[in-house]
Amino acid sequence: MASSPNERSEAAQKSVLAALNGERVGPPPVWMMRQAGRYLPEYRQLRADKGSFLDLVYDSDAAAEVTLQPLHRFPQLDAAILFSDILIVPFAIGQNLTFVAGEGPRLTPPLMTAALDDLTPFLARLEPIYETVRKVKADLDPATTLIGFAGAPLTVATYMVAGQGSRDQSETRRLAYGDPALFQAIIGRIEQVTVDYLSGQIEAGAEAVQLFDSWAGSLAPAEFERWVFAPTSRIAAAVGE
């Protein structure tokens, strides 16, 4: 006997959360890291209407709509992933954030030329993201899991130091080895804000959260332990309390 859509959806939710808790489930639940975005014509239209990427992220109605678009088109997906950007954290820490067409994000001033203590935090910049989470949660099928996220400290630090993306992370490595105390302070500041940010997403309705660490694979074992495993473990412990 075929199950009803509600029964299938309820089972999907249970399997997502069970899988994230390390349980063996089948069939495996499915969601995609970039399931909301440019491959969808409805996203491209909304993106064009908003003008800038940051305006889209900070319009909670629009960001909620983008988060839900893949679920409308592909109802078999078992989770929604929040539509936002990993650079919201350095924006909240006090760097200016812009997105340059054809080039990508820019953070100013880059921390190779500016002091961390000169940045003025604007943690209120996180509030619209929480509002997006609340709006998605209100419109989402109750049996579909909502996943929030943030950038992991190393990857976020790479952008903060260089002011933009870097394939070889040369500026970050130069600072980390040349002034390890400052680099550790940057990692620590990111940790603090990320704990608050992920906790805020959970309070707003996210059922699971994750960290994206794009550049972790480029590190030697000792660097990985110091700049990836240790801060990630501290964030996970703090958010899980």
Describe every region a protein language model picked out.
Residues A2-L97, R234:
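N-terminal basic, low-complexity leaders that serve as flexible interaction/assembly modules and, when applicable
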Residues S15, R38-P41, G104-T108, Q169-E171, ...:
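Short hydrophobic/aromatic-rich motifs at helix boundaries and adjacent loops
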Residues A19-Q35, L77-G102, L123-D168:
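Glycine-rich, aromatic-flanked loop segments that form ligand/cofactor-binding clefts
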Residues Q45-A48, M112-A115, L175-G178, S214-A216:
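A short alpha-helix capping/helix-coil boundary motif
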Residues S52-L77, T120-K137, L182-D196:
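Glycine-rich anion/phosphate-binding loops
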Residues I81-A101, P105-F122, A206-E225:
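Glycine-rich, proline-tolerant flexible connector loops at the mouths of alpha/beta enzymes
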Residues R125, E131-E241:
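Active-site loop segments of alpha/beta catalytic cores
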